[in-house]
């Protein structure tokens, strides 16, 4: 745990800047280590068990989902200093490199935020089988099927570069296969909800990386 006490008043300007940079890096790393596994686990619970959870009702479904999330969050917070024991230190080159994934993540977020309402982001359509919802195929969803997950990966990569903790590099690597598993589960559920329309959409639009056609290159 990083500590900032009265002693910092005797440090020179450069030392104070380094100290506060350490604090920022540490708490940014905590944010990712806490948020990413909890978010991924939520979908790993919702998607495989969505039919069972629907029968329980929305309130009970969220209570069921919350139990493993709370346990995981508590475990991460308890072992946070062990998880962050390997610190490679502030690296200004990597911090500069983090701008690229951060910028791409922001661009993707701005392009999909109007389509993803809060109920969609917390899994309400999956947990309420009677509400089919709307299949998103316009805007960025006309180029990639899962912009939200691509955005998440870019955020994690940016934070890994900026904080330069081993745990965040490992989190980035582990997130890739886990997100792909979540995507496969999500697509199975979407096929159940939208049938042929979603299958046709999958044939037209790639999952993660947009198609670059000769026409789009010429237009650019």
What annotation goes with each model-predicted range?
Residues 3, 10-137, 155-220:
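Membrane-anchoring alpha-helices and their flanking helix-loop junctions
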Residues 137-138, 142-150:
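Histidine-centered phosphotransfer motif of kinases
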């Amino acid at each position: 745990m990083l500590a900032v006490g009265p002693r910092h008043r005797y440090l020179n300007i450069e030392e104070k800047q380094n100290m506060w940079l350490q604090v920022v890096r540490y708490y940014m790393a905590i944010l990712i280590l806490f948020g990413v596994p909890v978010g991924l686990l939520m979908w790993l619970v919702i998607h495989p068990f969505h039919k069972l959870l629907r029968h329980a009702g929305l309130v009970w479904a969220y209570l069921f989902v919350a139990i493993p999330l709370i346990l995981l969050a508590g475990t991460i917070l308890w072992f946070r200093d062990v998880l962050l024991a390997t610190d490679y230190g502030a690296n200004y080159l990597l911090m500069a490199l983090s701008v690229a994934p951060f910028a791409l993540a922001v661009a993707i977020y701005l392009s999909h935020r109007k389509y993803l309402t809060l109920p969609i982001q917390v899994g309400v359509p999956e947990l309420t089988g009677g509400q089919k919802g709307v299949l998103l195929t316009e805007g960025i969803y006309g180029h990639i099927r899962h912009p939200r997950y691509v955005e998440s990966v870019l955020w994690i990569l940016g934070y890994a570069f900026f904080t330069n903790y081993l745990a965040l590099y490992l989190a980035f690597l582990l997130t890739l296969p886990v997100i792909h598993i979540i995507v496969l589960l999500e697509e199975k559920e979407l096929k159940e909800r939208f049938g042929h329309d979603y299958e046709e959409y999958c044939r037209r639009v790639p999952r993660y990386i947009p198609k670059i056609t000769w026409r789009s290159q010429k237009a650019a």
